[in-house]
């Protein structure tokens, strides 16, 4: 079975054959993407508030985890998980956002959430 990774759009080390899937509210980087999981993006207001330092990283994380729980409860996250499982039959997957690996980013929260709730092993690429 193939693997799931997280990374950032401008990572030049990503292989050409990896399935690239954005998980942010806006895609500013042109590219050939396998699909787009906009549902996994944090709320735009939380991103703005974090950027403007109106909320802390802890508050952002709690808000994002609440969003993930909500989409898990309404079963839309199950559809994404099923799609990921199908895609893993063909090649590795990378879930993309903008922040560099050493910066705070929702993709790291998502990776932990998917590990805890769906037993996915996700690494930063």
What are these regions (language model features)?
Residues 1-125:
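Residues lining hydrophobic/aromatic ligand-binding pockets adjacent to catalytic sites
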